Regions:
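Acidic, glycine-rich loop-and-beta core segments that form the ion-binding/anion-interacting portion
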Residues: 263-264
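N-terminal donor/sugar-recognition subdomains of glycan-related enzymes
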Residues: 1-258, 267-270
Length: 270
């Protein structure tokens, strides 16, 4: 464990994701996982279950070589977009970044906040955290994926993506990651269908837009809602990490306020 790694990682995390920083900064790190030195030198990770049985997460011999060999089977050089399922000590992501460009998108999903807190103490993650294409999601509710993935929906749907799994971690949280992957696949499949539909009917869409243009221009828009609910507070709710953080507060206050939701946030709020 080195304080310099932790300090550097927290500084990087605070710059790129203040919400995740606030979630992690007070955690001390998981006691279910053990970090030791591999025979080749870099740290390795193992898991101790409730019966005291040890399970290796990364190779005890050479975790870097293990990650490299696995990624070769995925032909990552053919991919621009990556979904990393299970972070661990980050060896797979470090190898992806070696050949990544500024256009590469790497979305990382880790279930265990305490494991992530432990990893920040053991490995310098600054190169991962500060890569412009990296987004890191820790203990994210799969129901909120719409908002989290929306900014890259078209990119991932058109250019596809490579799923990279830290299998030993996925196996430890199988129910969570199975649901997560199912929701991700469903989300991007729907996006592909929508893009195909738009392509087929694009002329009709533009025809309808121009046909309705006068009505758009004459519509009072949101001004028509002015003073509709005097003395009743209203909240406009978007999707994303902030919704994940505040949804319980919104649910407990629903009878005291008027909630306006974007489409991607509606389902989780119902």
């Amino acid at each position: 464990m080195t304080d310099s790694f932790l300090s550097r990682n927290l500084d990087s995390l605070k710059k790129v994701d203040i919400a995740l920083f606030n979630k992690i900064v007070s955690l001390k790190g998981s006691t279910e996982y053990v970090v030791t030195r591999s025979k080749s030198g870099p740290p390795t990770l193992s898991y101790m279950d409730s019966r005291g049985k040890k399970k290796q997460i990364h190779s005890n011999y050479d975790p870097v070589l293990e990650a490299t060999r696995y990624l070769k089977t995925l032909n990552i050089e053919e991919s621009l977009n990556f979904l990393v399922i299970g972070l661990g000590l980050g060896y797979q992501v470090f190898e992806i970044i070696k050949s990544a460009t500024s256009q590469t998108k790497i979305y990382i999903f880790e279930k265990d906040p305490e494991l992530f807190a432990l990893a920040l103490r053991e490995v310098d993650f600054s190169i991962i955290l500060e890569h412009p294409g990296v987004r890191l999601f820790v203990d994210t509710d799969p129901r909120f994926l719409d908002g989290l993935l929306e900014s890259e929906q078209t990119n991932f749907a058109l250019n596809n993506y490579c799923v990279v799994k830290q299998k030993s971690l996925v196996d430890e949280n199988l129910n969570y990651f199975d649901v997560l992957l199912e929701e991700i696949e469903k989300y991007f499949n729907e996006a592909k269908i929508n893009l195909k539909t738009q392509s087929i009917h694009s002329k009709l869409y533009y025809k309808n837009i121009f046909s309705n243009l006068n009505d758009f221009l004459q519509s009072p828009g949101i001004k028509s809602l002015r003073n509709c609910l005097p003395d009743i507070p209203a909240i406009v709710c978007s999707a994303g990490p902030s919704l994940d953080t505040n949804i319980q507060l919104l649910n407990t206050s629903r009878k005291r306020l008027f909630l306006i939701s974007v489409g991607t946030a509606l389902k989780p709020l119902l």
